[in-house]
């Protein structure tokens, strides 16, 4: 890490993931910026930077889960930073909400992922840093630079010691490229689950393409929400004779009873990142958290020094 000359660097945290921001600042050995946030009786959000940011390189860390309030807070932070004459303002969005609304797949629906990109730019973002977007084409929705990080180093390092007799599973066709990159990195086989989704947050496992009998299985995905699809995949793999079953998922939304579903499933361990805070896990939980702080910290300091970020990720996306 090149930590020299960070005098113009300032990192501020929104309210959605203060813990991750603290870890980023600790990694970089910089003090977290001071900011005031108030919620008025009618729900309006008020933001004030408590230190001078004129001419500074400002990074605002805020995941947008749940999206409505946290996105609005980020927009207000961006506007306040721009109006305070920051030299450059970067929105660091560990989890980019609305990413699943990335295309017009039905009549009379919005492409909300594009809308969010537009309003972030309009609010004052000069650049965006995010991780494992649900759809790669979202990168093209922005008219400003976007650094797209990958959580894969967190998990491939973990599974270097567990790769014997391992196959990597993509839970759908859309994730096959990232699953293939894991498989190549771990020298493992590749399996695809063919599924259809009759309704939102519901998926029916249709067919498993590949051999899992007697194999250790690693399911990789960008997010886990209600866990219904994930648990169904675990069950289907187990019925086909899979031995140990692991998961590596970047964004742990874990809505509703998702944690209970995971704990009661046949999975051995589910690894997730801290792009979304998880504070209610039991000590012996099957869900294991891997911090993404170093990846975000390195991307911030390299961005600050105008250095390459792609070298952080030796990932084959072909």
Where do the language-model regions lie?
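PRPP-associated nucleotide enzymes
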Residues: 1-318
């Amino acid at each position: 890490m090149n930590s020299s000359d960070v005098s113009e660097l300032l990192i501020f945290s929104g309210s959605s993931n203060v813990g991750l921001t603290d870890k980023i600042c600790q990694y970089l050995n910089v003090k977290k910026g001071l900011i005031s946030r108030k919620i008025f009786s009618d729900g309006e959000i008020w933001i004030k930077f408590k230190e001078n940011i004129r001419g500074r390189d400002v990074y605002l860390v805020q995941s947008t889960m749940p999206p409505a309030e946290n996105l609005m807070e980020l927009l207000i932070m961006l506007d306040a930073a721009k109006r305070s004459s920051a030299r450059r303002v970067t929105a660091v969005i560990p989890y980019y909400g609305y990413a699943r609304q990335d295309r017009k797949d039905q009549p009379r629906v919005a492409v909300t992922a594009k809308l969010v990109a537009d309003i972030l730019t309009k609010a004052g973002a000069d650049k965006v840093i995010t991780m494992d977007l649900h759809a790669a084409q979202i990168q093209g929705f922005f008219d400003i630079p976007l650094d797209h990080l990958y959580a894969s180093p967190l998990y491939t390092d973990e599974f270097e010691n567990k790769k014997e007799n391992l196959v990597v599973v993509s839970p759908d066709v859309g994730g096959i490229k990232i699953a293939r990159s894991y498989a190549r990195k771990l020298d493992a086989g590749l399996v695809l689950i063919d599924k259809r989704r009759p309704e939102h947050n519901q998926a029916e496992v249709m067919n498993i393409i590949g051999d899992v009998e007697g194999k250790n299985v690693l399911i990789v995905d960008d997010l886990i929400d209600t866990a219904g699809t994930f648990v169904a995949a675990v069950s289907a793999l187990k019925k086909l004779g899979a031995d140990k079953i692991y998961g590596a998922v970047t964004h742990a939304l874990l809505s509703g009873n998702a944690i209970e579903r995971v704990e009661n499933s046949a999975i051995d361990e589910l690894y997730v990142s801290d792009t979304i805070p998880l504070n209610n896990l039991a000590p012996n939980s099957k869900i294991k958290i891997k911090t993404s702080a170093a990846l975000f910290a390195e991307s911030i300091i390299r961005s600050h020094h105008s250095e390459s970020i792609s070298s952080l990720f030796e990932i084959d996306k072909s």
